[in-house]
Amino acid sequence: MGSSSFLVLMVSLALVTLVVVEGVKGGIEKAGVCPADNVRCFKSNPPQCHTDQDCLGERKCCYLHCGFKCVIPVKKLEEGGNKDEDVSGPHPEPGWEAKSPGSSSTGCPQI
């Protein structure tokens, strides 16, 4: 095998390797966004997934509580929605308001 054939073979192998690695890392991203993670970790846990394709159903591969794992995503904000709105936590039912003992219907303490 001549040196030019060897060079063509090596370049071809390198290109195939890059394409395969990109395909494994990438994949199709599932709908939704990963939940917010406010946990501070001293050490990361081993990953349970690497891409969304590793997760069953609608679950996404997200970094949560010190490691990558398959979790149910939160829904994306609607077009034109408030970008500062927190979509990661539970939200009360419409009409619900916090009241403490001794407070008025406005939620302010009675004097």
From Swiss-Prot:
Keywords: Antibiotic, Antimicrobial, Disulfide bond, Protease inhibitor, Secreted, Serine protease inhibitor, Signal
Residue span, WAP domain: 27-74
Gene3D superfamilies assigned to the protein according to its UniProt record, in alphabetical order: Elafin-like
Record carries keyword Disulfide bond: yes
InterPro entries: Elafin-like_sf, WAP_dom
A Pfam family the protein falls into: WAP
Gene Ontology CC, one term: extracellular region
Chief location of this protein within or outside the cell: secreted
Cysteine disulfide partners in this protein: 34-62, 41-66, 49-61, 55-70
SUPFAM superfamilies cross-referenced by the UniProt entry: Elafin-like
Feature: compositional bias, Polar residues: 101-111
Function: Antibacterial protein. Putative acid-stable proteinase inhibitor.
Name listed for the protein in its UniProt record: WAP four-disulfide core domain protein 12
GO BP term, pick one: defense response to bacterium
GO MF assignments: serine-type endopeptidase inhibitor activity
UniProt entry tagged with the keyword Secreted: yes
Highest taxon listed in the record's lineage: Eukaryota
